[in-house]
Amino acid sequence: MAVFHDMLLQPLGMFLCLSLQLSSATFIRYSSTCFTFDEYYTITLDIKASSHIYESNAVYSVFVPVNDSVYAVVMKTLDENSDSAGLWQRADKNCYSNSTYYVKDQYMTVLEAQWQAPEPENITEVEIQAFTVQIRALPILSTLKLREKLSTLALAAKIPQSSAFKPFFMITPKSIRLEGLANQVFSSPITEAIYILLAFLTSTLLF
């Protein structure tokens, strides 16, 4: 009877052990679906893009430097309100706020990712964030900004007007007339007295 009891308990124990292992493995796979980073380094890795001018619905190629210690790159794009924007194409794993690209070649030096800007939503600037996930170190964050190209009218509106650019107006009196001024000068009493004195002196000298 004891032998039969042991024969029943042994398979049951193995089944329970296997169930616990499968449950743990399933939990690990679920928790690692999306990367979240509480700690990371912020270092400039010279991220490049096919264009630094932001345009709605455009597709950009983003190049991130990697090495043999990097096994994944997590890409994220934020608008001016820190909301997720656009779509990362052909990613190995897409999440709500980021997308993951795995480095499948240990000799790879640059990882290329494609990002599509959203439809027009009054967005004038976005920040591309790249987290390089390393095997035995904290992830490294590098950023790159794309800005909308300013139009000529918008650029002119930003230039302050100084006094050098203000129009110059010459103010002249409207009621001044030279002829009237001459008549006033020659018709004054002093002028008449001078004329009389000159006439008297002239007549005295002649006679």
Swiss-Prot record:
Mod. after translation: N-glycosylated.
Membrane topology: Lipid-anchor; GPI-anchor
Glycosylation, residue list: N67, N122
Main location: membrane
Function: Modulates leading keratinocyte migration and cellular adhesion to matrix proteins during a wound-healing response and promotes wound repair. May play a role during trichilemmal differentiation of the hair follicle.
Protein's UniProt name: Placenta-expressed transcript 1 protein
Keyword Amino-acid biosynthesis belongs to the record: no
Cellular compartments per GO CC: apical plasma membrane; external side of plasma membrane; extracellular region; plasma membrane
Family annotation (InterPro entries): PLET1
Location in the cell: Apical cell membrane
Position of the signal peptide: 1-25
Propeptide residue span(s): 188-207
Keywords: Cell membrane, Differentiation, Glycoprotein, GPI-anchor, Lipoprotein, Membrane, Signal
Gene Ontology terms describing biological process: cell differentiation; negative regulation of cell-matrix adhesion; positive regulation of cell migration; wound healing, spreading of epidermal cells
The keyword Signal is annotated on this UniProt entry: yes
GPI-anchor amidated serine lipid modification positions: S187
